[in-house]
Regions:
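N-terminal leader/linker segments that initiate helical-solenoid repeat arrays
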Residues: 32-82
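Register position in tetratricopeptide repeats
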Residues: 93, 127, 161-162, 194-197
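Residue-level recognition of tetratricopeptide repeat
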Residues: 114, 148, 165, 181-182
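TPR alpha-solenoid repeat register
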Residues: 117, 151, 184-185
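Conserved small-residue packing positions in alpha-helical repeats and bundles
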Residues: 48-52, 88, 122, 156
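Alpha-helical adaptor scaffolds
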Residues: 77-144
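Terminal, low-structured helical/coil segments at or just beyond the last alpha-helical repeat
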Residues: 74, 169-200
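Canonical tetratricopeptide repeat
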Residues: 86, 120, 154, 187-188
Length: 200
């Protein structure tokens, strides 16, 4: 009986060791996969932004813009957060601003480095007329993703609503450098005209 007990104990230890080894391999491979996924995500964005700047016409630019938005809305490592963002966006589009705000805030809590979560919350705050809070979230969005033309045009819209036309113009000028065919930059001449009139 003593001999059998030792054998059972030995087999148990082997099983535990195999389980620990499996767990270590699993988590290490997950980390590698996540890192690879994020690397792929960043590389695709880099390519799309080059294509966006070099687009020859509006139709070509719109296709690239959609690709960029698809990547922005996709968390590079966590599908669950992607699903949450989709839910919050749907609620926001349906006018459920308070619920959307809570969801976006929860995503930010879980991953404060995801620029699109900040941008979505900035958007819902804009819709709620909470301009100061929206501007704070836009600032954070641009710290994480300086090329975020959606955040720049959104900030320009807030400044237009606040009649701070020079700030609006500055943001749209930055947008044009990143995305020359952006529909938002079409109002640059109007803003310049308003500012010229104010100077007279």
């Amino acid at each position: 009986m003593g001999s059998n007990s030792k054998i059972e104990k030995s087999e148990l230890m082997k099983s535990i060791f195999k389980f620990i080894l499996f767990i270590n391999l699993f988590f290490n491979s997950s980390i590698i996969f996540s890192a690879a996924s994020e690397y792929y995500h960043k590389n695709k964005l880099e390519k799309f932004f080059i294509d966006l700047k070099n687009s020859k016409n509006l139709n070509e630019a719109i296709v690239v813009e959609k690709n960029i938005w698809s990547l922005w809305n996709l968390h590079p490592q966590n599908q669950f957060l992607t699903n949450k963002l989709e839910l919050g966006t749907e609620l926001m589009q349906n006018g459920q601003h308070n619920y959307a705000y809570k969801i976006f805030s929860n995503i930010i809590y879980e991953d404060p480095n995801w620029s699109e979560a900040w941008n979505k919350r900035a958007t819902v705050l804009f819709l709620m007329k909470e301009y100061d809070l929206s501007l704070e979230d836009i600032k954070k969005t641009l710290e994480l993703e300086p090329r975020h033309f959606g955040a720049l045009t959104g900030r320009a819209q807030i400044y237009i609503d606040l009649m701070e036309y020079q700030k609006a113009l500055d943001n749209l000028t930055l947008t044009k450098e990143i995305y020359p065919f952006s529909r938002g930059v079409n109002i640059i001449p109007k803003l310049e005209k308003i500012l010229n009139i104010e100077e007279i």
